[in-house]
């Protein structure tokens, strides 16, 4: 295919604005699959993706489209995830394209994540083409939404294509716009090979399959390739394109998007965003924008029964074959036994991994409260990174703690602005910017990541009745007065219940935890003292009252000293019990930590 007839594009859309349905229609229109094979949401291949209606991994499809001018064009569509946790995957998918369709729901209008991805695309000098979807709905207001796109995003949307992916109206117009508005790829087919890895996943039979965009040069079957970030070399066994089904072509040239299989054994060997080149004539520099993906949120995950530990470890190893951003290391806890400390990109990522472990590998798991990474400077001048409360050094050894700050961009209708500002202030946020776009307001806050990670998203949705949308990215580490709140039960620390929090909130947080635990721990034959402490200073306490038998019920009248003797005996028994008795913590107690502050 000549380069002038290739179009590489992706679709930018908020969750539920109809991206996957639109891509299904495009595939159907170009005859990529027969009607019998046409399942809903062809590109979302994980069950979980279909169920939650979100796209997690990037996928691609190559379609041949006969345009109205009689020419045949090759359209390479790269599907991108839309959720805020997967922004790096989005930026890699966008880097492989020359243009993007900005799909906006004609009923709902522009949302913050769409906006964030759209700005990423504009920064990369991509052509952004607006498309109004769902115009068949009774509540659709295409004219208002077109104005909103112009106000907020700043691109011309008066002649935006209007379509309905569900009913198939306007699909051909969308294809024509792709051909006419999006520029063809540039790139010298004679230059040394440079290919961008858009995504990699693991196939049980063929090893790692990488989705690549050839930027310069060409790649043939049996070529020896080199991965530029780690210098490993492999031989290409298979090369081709997805029409959603894999089709071997034996060659890919500059400007094209396809897959390669080169017998790579683990996904770390082909990291997303890396550059592939030929071993015999390597390119002189990597493609820009590659970065190692860093986990933002850590949580300890433990199997409920310790017999499952081996299965749990194998399950994690299998999951990490397909997910390069998953980081894990063994951890043991006095309360929960052996498990793993796992790093995630964000809360959605954490929920998805946990759900996949429970669903696909049939494991029962306990999760401890998620924490972010803190930088701790000790009095000896060393800098440590701490990802769990247990690793925090003793109070006397800490010179300062720095916590990660994020820049959060929030888009909200004017009438809910007050609620959102109140919420951000409560979460220790600092407002840095505020602009009005028609009825919407865009506010920018600097917030501590620890506050955003826990329940900020849920609370933002509830205070704004679901209208506010959020996008955030890591900004820097900032010195902050953080403390560890320990929970003591009958004077013994329970490591799995400790949390790191800001000193201002520590008393409230401690009190809430203690109250929550008091409701959950069953009563025993002796008093159970639950305390929250910072260092040696107890900030909150509560007692689970003992159950006691009425020992003097059998006495009729008679002398009072007889009753006293029985009560005294009971008291001594209780005292002895308290010294030897252990408190069994129920499963819910560990979940209580996650719910505090909601």
Swiss-Prot record:
Q: Cellular location of this protein? A: Cell inner membrane
Catalytic activity, EC: 3.6.5.n1
Which cysteines share a disulfide bond? none
Recorded catalytic reaction(s): these are: GTP + H2O = GDP + phosphate + H(+)
What are the tr-type G domain coordinates in residue numbering?
4-186
Q: What is its main location?
A: membrane
Listed A to Z, the keywords are: Cell inner membrane, Cell membrane, GTP-binding, Hydrolase, Membrane, Nucleotide-binding, Protein biosynthesis
The UniProt similarity line reads: Belongs to the TRAFAC class translation factor GTPase superfamily. Classic translation factor GTPase family. LepA subfamily.
**Sorted alphabetically, which NCBIfam families does this protein's record hold?**
lepA, small_GTP
| Family annotation (HAMAP family) | LepA (MF_00071)
Q: What is this protein called?
A: Elongation factor 4
């Amino acid at each position: 295919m000549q380069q002038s007839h290739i179009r590489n594009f992706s679709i930018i859309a908020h969750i539920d604005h109809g991206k996957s349905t639109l891509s299904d229609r495009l595939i159907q229109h170009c005859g990529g699959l027969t009607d019998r094979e046409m399942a809903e949401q062809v590109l979302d291949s994980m069950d979980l993706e279909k169920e939650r209606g979100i796209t997690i991994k990037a996928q691609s499809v190559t379609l041949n489209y006969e345009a109205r001018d009689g020419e045949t064009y090759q359209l390479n569509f790269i599907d991108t995830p839309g959720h805020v946790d997967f922004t790096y995957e989005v930026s890699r998918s966008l880097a492989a394209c020359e243009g993007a369709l900005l799909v906006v729901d004609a009923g709902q209008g522009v949302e913050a994540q769409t906006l964030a991805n759209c700005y990423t695309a504009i920064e990369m000098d991509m052509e952004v083409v607006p498309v109004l979807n769902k115009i068949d709905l009774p509540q659709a207001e295409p004219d208002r939404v077109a104005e909103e796109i112009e106000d907020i995003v700043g691109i011309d949307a008066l002649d935006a294509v209007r379509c309905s992916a569900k009913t198939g109206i306007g699909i051909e117009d969308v294809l024509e716009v792709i051909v006419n508005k999006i520029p063809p790829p540039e790139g010298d087919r004679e230059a040394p090979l440079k290919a961008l890895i858009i995504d990699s996943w693991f196939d049980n039979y063929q090893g790692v399959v990488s989705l690549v965009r050839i930027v310069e040069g060409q790649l043939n079957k049996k070529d020896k390739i080199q991965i530029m970030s780690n210098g490993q070399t492999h031989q290409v066994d298979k090369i081709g394109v997805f029409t959603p089904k894999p089709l071997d072509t034996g060659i890919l040239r500059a400007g094209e998007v396809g897959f390669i299989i080169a017998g790579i054994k683990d996904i770390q060997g082909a990291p997303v965003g890396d550059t592939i080149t030929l071993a015999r004539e390597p390119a002189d520099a990597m493609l820009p924008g590659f970065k190692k993906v860093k986990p933002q949120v850590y949580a300890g995950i433990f199997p409920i029964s310790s017999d499952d530990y081996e299965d749990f470890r194998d399950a994690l190893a299998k999951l990490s074959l397909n997910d390069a951003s998953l980081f894990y290391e063994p951890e043991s806890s006095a309360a929960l036994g052996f498990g793993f400390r796992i790093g995630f990109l964000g809360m959605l990522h954490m929920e998805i991994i946990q759900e996949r472990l429970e669903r696909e590998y049939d494991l029962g798991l306990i999760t401890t409260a998620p924490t972010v990474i803190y930088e701790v400077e000790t009095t000896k001048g060393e800098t440590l990174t701490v990802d769990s409360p247990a690793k925090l050094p003793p109070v006397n050894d800490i010179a300062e703690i720095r916590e990660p700050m994020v820049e959060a961009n929030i888009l909200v209708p004017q009438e809910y602005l007050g609620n959102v500002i109140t919420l951000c202030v409560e979460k220790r946020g600092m407002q840095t910017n505020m602009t009005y776009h028609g009825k919407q307001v865009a506010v920018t806050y600097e917030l501590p990541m620890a506050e955003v990670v826990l329940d900020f998203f849920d609370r933002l949705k509830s205070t704004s009745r679901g209208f506010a949308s959020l996008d955030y990215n890591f900004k820097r580490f900032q010195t902050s007065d953080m403390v560890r709140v320990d929970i003591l039960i009958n004077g013994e620390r329970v490591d799995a219940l400790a949390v790191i929090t800001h000193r201002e909130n520590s008393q409230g947080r401690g009190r809430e935890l203690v109250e929550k635990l008091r409701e959950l721990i069953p009563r025993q034959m002796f008093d159970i003292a639950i305390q929250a402490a910072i260092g040696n200073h107890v900030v909150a306490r509560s007692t689970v009252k003992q159950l006691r038998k009425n020992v003097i019920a059998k006495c009729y009248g008679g002398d009072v000293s007889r009753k006293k003797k029985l009560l005294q005996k009971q008291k001594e028994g209780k005292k002895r019990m308290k010294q030897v008795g252990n408190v069994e913590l129920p499963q819910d107690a560990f979940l209580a930590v996650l719910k505090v502050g909601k």
